[in-house]
Structure formats: structure tokens, C-alpha cells
């Protein structure tokens, strides 16, 4: 069994969830988020692209309904003992099979919370669930319950986060060895991802973002590779990933001599990062974090070039994204708590001058000032050859 946490850790998590369920007066929950299943049981798969559901009750039952392809996956990677299979066939309805399973679990008329807000729940499944369960039980949206619990990391989780951060640093060191005029983006990506795999890391929740020249202004991955010019810019956003826990980083590297605009934008990003660090303390909100970022950026005249969010929580995430909640945007009332892992990204994209500048790193919050998990310098990275 490939469990990455102690039995005591899993028991503590289930106890936390049952306490929240009791407070919310829920008899059971239907878990569709792969992150929830991994956190609660260790179950590790990308099989959530198909229908699967983990039913948990306040009495302590855990029953997984999944496909045959994931039966052994659940046995090998989780502490779930009751694994049931829905059958692939022409008129198969896993929702009806789930309803029958809930009846067998004596949950007719129960109060059941459902995880709707997750990539493991399609609109079609949601419609079918609502149609079948509305008259069967008292159902409600419980999407935020486990994410709120996952946001604060345990000591066992923090060990993996620190390892992910170490791998993220190694990935950037590997990239800097490759970045030069004439370098191919493919070799840079290969070096970064190779450093993480060689260090025992995992695939991240989404692709690494890489773009040079005009495409250095992009915040998402896209297909196609480019060779760096004599004077160029390349934006990298990547994450070390270990046991699915992420530590993200972001840098724009200047190839050749930085322009005055690069220097101006870097100064704004550096000041903004310093400002948000003062807000990464218990009692502040994720809205406060964003406000600190916006104030510094706007003071440098960067309002039209910045984004409307400047970071987010990180943890054990699955595709299609390593981004977790809460997110730092204006007015978000979510509170900063000790032992959160938060990625702060200062992103400036000036389409007028075709200039990019980014600066980002991951922090662990404490009872006081935050701890940066990276050992990389915050200087503007420049490669001249």
C-alpha cells in the first residue's frame, strides 16, 4: 500500500471532517474532488476524468464507487476497504448505481453534502445527481468544507512542501544553465522537468508556463517552441511537486542587456512582493494581500499592466491546475492562518512596449512573519551568453 502519511494523520483528518459535518448537520458527503479523496484516504489517480464518488458518513464509513480500471489503484494507494465498481455498458448509469448504494447505506432521507465545485464533477453528472437525489435525500452544496480544511497544512504535509520547494529551486538552476542566445525552449523545459523527476518529484498539476520574445507576456502554457535571440526575454512559471504537493515559482529572465522598461517593471514587482509579505500573517485577509500588491503596482503606474489577482494557496492538487483556494483578489474575506502555503506572483505584462516582468515565490505562513520556501535570489535574472 503506497500511503504517504501515517495512520494517525489520516485519522486526524477524518476526525476534523466529521466534526465539520456535525457542525453543518450533515449525515454524509459525496466527494468528487480528487484532492479531497487524496487528503482523506491517500487515493491517488487521474481516474476522476470519469465518474467516481467517495461516500463518507459522519459515523465513519468510507465507500468508493469507481470504474474497474481504478479498483486496484484504490487498493494500492488508499486506506479505503470498501470499493465498489460501476459497470461500463451501453445504458450504464453510475448515478443510479450510486443512489442504490446510498439506499443500502441507509441514507434515504439523510442530509447529504455534495462537492459540486470540482473538476471531478461535470455539469451532466450534477444534473443527473440533482434529478435522482432531490426526492431521495436533503442535498446541499458542501464544496468548500474540505478545501478549507486542506488549506492549513499539518507537519507531515509541510515536509513534502519543503521538498517540493527544494525541487523548484533545482529546476530554475537547471533552466539558467540552458538559457542563452540560441537556446531552444524545449531544452530549457526538459532540464527543468528533468531536475524535478531526478529528485523524486511528480508531474505538476498543470504544464510549466514558458514563453519568450512576444510570448513572454503569456500566463498560460501553449504548444510550440522558440529559439532565444541575442536580446530576448523568457518568462517561466513552474512548480516543484512532491507527493502532489506544490511549491510554485515565477521569473522573467532577460537575455542580453535589460531595457529601461525591464528595470522599471522589475522595481515595481520587487516592491509589490515586499508589500504582500507584510500581509502574509494571521489576521490579515487574502483581500488585504491583493490590496498591498495593487497599491505598489499602481504607485509605479502599472495598473493597466498588472492582473486582478496576485496569488493563491497551494497544496496537493491534480490536473488541470495546481492553483488552490483561497486566492488573493480584491475583497476576498478569507483569512490568512498559520501553516498555509501561499504562492505570491507579481506579474506585469506591458503589451505597448512588448515587455514582460514577473517575480513569484512560495511562502509558508507562521504565527508571525512568513517563511519564504525558496533559496533563490530575488535579483533580476540576466543571462548575457
Model-predicted segments: where are they?
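Active-site neighborhoods and metal-handling regions in enzymes and metal-associated proteins
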Residues: 1-385
Amino acid at each position: 500500500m503506497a500511503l504517504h502519511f501515517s495512520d494517525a494523520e489520516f485519522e486526524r483528518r477524518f476526525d476534523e471532517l466529521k466534526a465539520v459535518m456535525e457542525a453543518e448537520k450533515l449525515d454524509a458527503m459525496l466527494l468528487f474532488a480528487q484532492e479531497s479523496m487524496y487528503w482523506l484516504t491517500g487515493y491517488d489517480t487521474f481516474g476522476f476524468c470519469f465518474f467516481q464518488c467517495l461516500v463518507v458518513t459522519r459515523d465513519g464509513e468510507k465507500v468508493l464507487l469507481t470504474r474497474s480500471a481504478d479498483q486496484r489503484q484504490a487498493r494500492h494507494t488508499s486506506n479505503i476497504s470498501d470499493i465498489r465498481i460501476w459497470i461500463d455498458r451501453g445504458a450504464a448509469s453510475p448515478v443510479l448505481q450510486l443512489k442504490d448504494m446510498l439506499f443500502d447505506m441507509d441514507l434515504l432521507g439523510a442530509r447529504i453534502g455534495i462537492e459540486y465545485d470540482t473538476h471531478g464533477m461535470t455539469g451532466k453528472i450534477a444534473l443527473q445527481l440533482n434529478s435522482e437525489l432531490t426526492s431521495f435525500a436533503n442535498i446541499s452544496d458542501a464544496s468548500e468544507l474540505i478545501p478549507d480544511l486542506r488549506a492549513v497544512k499539518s507537519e507531515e504535509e509541510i515536509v513534502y512542501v519543503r521538498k517540493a520547494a527544494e525541487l523548484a529551486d533545482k529546476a530554475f538552476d537547471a533552466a539558467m544553465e540552458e538559457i542563452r542566445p540560441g537556446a531552444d525552449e524545449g531544452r530549457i523545459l526538459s532540464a527543468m522537468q528533468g531536475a524535478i523527476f531526478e529528485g523524486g518529484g511528480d508531474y505538476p498539476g498543470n504544464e510549466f508556463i514558458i514563453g519568450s520574445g512576444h510570448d513572454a507576456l503569456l500566463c498560460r502554457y501553449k504548444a510550440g517552441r522558440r529559439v532565444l535571440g541575442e536580446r530576448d526575454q523568457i518568462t517561466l512559471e513552474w512548480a516543484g511537486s512532491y507527493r502532489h504537493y506544490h511549491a510554485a515559482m515565477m521569473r522573467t529572465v532577460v537575455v542580453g542587456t535589460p531595457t529601461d522598461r525591464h528595470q522599471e517593471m522589475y522595481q515595481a514587482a520587487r516592491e509589490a512582493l515586499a508589500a504582500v509579505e507584510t500581509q502574509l500573517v494571521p489576521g490579515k485577509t487574502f483581500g488585504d494581500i491583493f490590496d498591498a500588491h495593487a497599491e505598489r503596482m499602481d504607485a509605479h503606474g502599472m495598473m493597466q499592466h498588472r492582473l486582478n489577482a496576485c496569488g493563491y494557496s497551494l497544496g496537493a492538487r491534480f490536473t488541470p491546475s495546481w492553483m488552490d483556494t483561497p486566492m488573493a483578489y480584491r475583497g476576498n474575506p478569507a483569512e490568512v492562518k498559520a501553516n498555509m502555503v501561499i504562492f505570491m506572483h507579481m506579474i506585469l505584462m506591458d503589451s505597448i512596449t512588448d515587455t514582460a516582468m514577473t517575480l513569484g515565490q512560495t511562502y509558508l505562513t507562521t504565527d508571525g512573519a512568513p517563511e519564504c520556501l525558496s533559496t533563490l535570489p530575488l535579483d533580476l535574472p540576466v543571462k548575457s551568453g
